[in-house]
């Protein structure tokens, strides 16, 4: 049934420009119509990460549900968790349209959205209505383009969402806000993480819970930069990493739209993001949680992220091309894999193929 829905929805949505198609898909999920059964429930897929118990390791990446409109609908598709955002303190329009481009031949997307969102207040109001509901919902926080103190924007994000988010993601790796990636430079990163974690700890005293904080990094980093980030993350006591955001590289892309500016996501990102993932796992050691994202479009690519060092895996662009049944299909196939290979937990495969990935050069 799900494959039929997928085959029907793609041509309908692809008849519209990408941003309008995205808006229509959000509207469809807001109706509450059960587009699928949510996939299998299997205890072998349960993963405990950063003090949170995930029913399965497959999550919806940030960027789809920017304004926290449909987190529960996403969980109902079979995702083990959903990440809303990126959300900035003040509403902002983002960059001029058109700003999303499908590269259908490459099963990829280029976006230069620029953190378009309705701001903290709207997202907070929606997430507050989830109080008492089950399901892991993270919030990805960013800085306004015109902010005079971007680090303060991240502090405000932590302060605003600590009580309503299962976890928080510090997004300093989008390529579509001028200067934002400069916060990954070691001196800036050190100050940012110190400030963010101070606010997190202040909020913990108020809400009686330390909300886990993850840092999302770019794939377009040097070996030296990765080492610096790893050291800062460990020193400042962050709860985990998300590897990685979209890339500025166009390697492996042949579609004419490849010349558009913006961040590339989808299948061509898989290789680079997985190399960076494995290198970061090697740098931070076995204890720090890592969420792997970039080019995941199947059970096998999800498994390979875990073999390369990921505790959890996120996807987004894969669902653009495969349809809303993708998460449930992946979860079902992960369960079958765990059963067929005699695993007690899918987590047992983590790190089983780090070396071939981590040894590859960052071209």
From Swiss-Prot:
Transmembrane residue ranges: none
Molecular function in Gene Ontology: dihydroorotate dehydrogenase (quinone) activity
Cofactor comment: Binds 1 FMN per subunit.
Pathway: Pyrimidine metabolism; UMP biosynthesis via de novo pathway; orotate from (S)-dihydroorotate (quinone route): step 1/1
A GO cellular component annotation in the UniProt record: cytoplasm
Binding site for substrate: 66, 111-115, 171, 176, 245-246
Membrane topology: Peripheral membrane protein
Active-site residue list: 174
Subunit structure of this chain's protein: Monomer.
GO terms for biological process, alphabetical: 'de novo' pyrimidine nucleobase biosynthetic process; 'de novo' UMP biosynthetic process
CDD domains: DHOD_2_like
NCBIfam families to which the protein is assigned, alphabetical: PRK05286.1-2 (NF003645), PRK05286.2-5 (NF003652), pyrD_sub2 (TIGR01036)
Sequence similarity: Belongs to the dihydroorotate dehydrogenase family. Type 2 subfamily.
Taxon lineage: Bacteria, Pseudomonadati, Pseudomonadota, Alphaproteobacteria, Hyphomicrobiales
Subcellular location(s) of the protein: Cell membrane
Described function: Catalyzes the conversion of dihydroorotate to orotate with quinone as electron acceptor.
The protein's required cofactors: FMN
EC code(s) of this entry: 1.3.5.2
Residues reported in the UniProt entry to bind FMN: 62-66, 86, 140, 171, 216, 244, 266, 295, 316-317
Catalysed conversion reaction: (S)-dihydroorotate + a quinone = orotate + a quinol
Name the UniProt record assigns to this protein: Dihydroorotate dehydrogenase (quinone)
Top EC category: oxidoreductase
Keywords, ordered alphabetically: Cell membrane, Flavoprotein, FMN, Membrane, Oxidoreductase, Pyrimidine biosynthesis
